[in-house]
């Protein structure tokens, strides 16, 4: 693994310049290895002029891409999946280097990217037509592409988010300009390069940038006809406000403070495994993290004991080390923010039940590590129970009744995921219907189920990704009506009267 990383680093130029990078040296930013704190490379960002160029090129490409048949677009997506598969190891190692996640987790991310292109490539040419017999009128529904679309991506899962936006967008006949997360842009830019070797010119493009300038310019452009953003609730709200000026439709996949509800009759072994997975996978830098565990009071002491023992065994280290469970968070700023939440939890009276041991010596001493942390005796009014921490920190609180559990879950401003664990299926389904979230996982916490709708409610956003309905979100509806010849078409009597000869 170290040899592969060395080859990738050696191949990177000192300054990465892309087609839509500008020449202004002040628009450069450094990409850092979060495991060591050392620079990987410098990226030359774009500016307002290059945004204009990218969108104009995308618009020109749309004029021909939109008329490709669904069968033709299907073949492009399937070919793209094959090409991405060839580069899967390279992409996983690059992602590990710039994001910090364990390379085995990065490999899973790239695998999902490949699968999502295959999924939409396999179904886009098989969607049924819609035809309605209204007596004197026949009516058909045509799903047309929007045009130039924009995808704004975060740093935590570049392959997953890129695939989730690009594949259905292109399958529906749109073109897309992406803006990668500034903390980890290299993997996304490499994915775009690979896709550009498959798709016609300018169908897929990306503009790197630092701060809000590039995304705001992309969203605000009059030629942009749809925007999809994955990020914080604050960034999603700002994007929606900008898009509203031009009445541009948006899909927003935002934050989460996801509850993991455990009743007294739950399978303890399953709960312990899924709780650790849900809380600490991807070092907690996940909108779907099970960061808020709610346990029935009868099971609370036993589960807390098991979770405490498990958290202490989690290994924190370099993602290139295949024995690592939890890598560093993506940046120094994120590290300091997560550590401040841990201190906040202590001040508010939560019990620090367990913490892992981050590396402190050698080349990893400058890394952005946060120890995996378990807080117990957490109440719903505490900051750590309400805020999206976006790091390897999980809280555990108790409840006495089903009604109390539902009320606590629904008190959150977020509404993305929830887990419900009980051997009583009727109760589990009753609770599921009462939870105000977009996705409920019953007796499992498997989040990456391609082919099912992914998305939230409330401050977690709106719109759904990763399923067949996503193709409709990336399309606009045109209704065509024509005479059936079976009976007269109704007409306004006034028109009949005045038009007689």
Swiss-Prot record:
InterPro entries for this protein: Ald_DH/histidinol_DH (IPR016161), Ald_DH_C (IPR016163), Ald_DH_CS_CYS (IPR016160), Ald_DH_CS_GLU (IPR029510), Ald_DH_N (IPR016162), Aldehyde_DH_dom (IPR015590)
Molecular function per GO: aldehyde dehydrogenase (NAD+) activity
Keywords assigned: NAD, Oxidoreductase
The keyword Nucleotide-binding appears for this protein: no
Substrates-to-products reaction catalysed: an aldehyde + NAD(+) + H2O = a carboxylate + NADH + 2 H(+)
KO phenotype (gene knockout): Leads to complete absence of citrinin production.
Ligand binding (NAD(+)): 231-236
Membrane-spanning parts: none
Active site: 253, 287
Top enzyme class: oxidoreductase
Pathway in which this enzyme or protein is active: Mycotoxin biosynthesis
This enzyme's EC code(s): 1.2.1.3
Function: Non-reducing polyketide synthase; part of the gene cluster that mediates the biosynthesis of the mycotoxin citrinin, a hepato-nephrotoxic compound to humans due to inhibition of respiration complex III. The pathway begins with the synthesis of a keto-aldehyde intermediate by the citrinin PKS (pksCT also named citS) from successive condensations of 4 malonyl-CoA units, presumably with a simple acetyl-CoA starter unit. Release of the keto-aldehyde intermediate is consistent with the presence of the C-terminal reductive release domain.
Family per similarity comment: Belongs to the aldehyde dehydrogenase family.
Protein name in the entry: Aldehyde dehydrogenase citD
Origin organism lineage: Eukaryota, Fungi, Dikarya, Ascomycota, Pezizomycotina
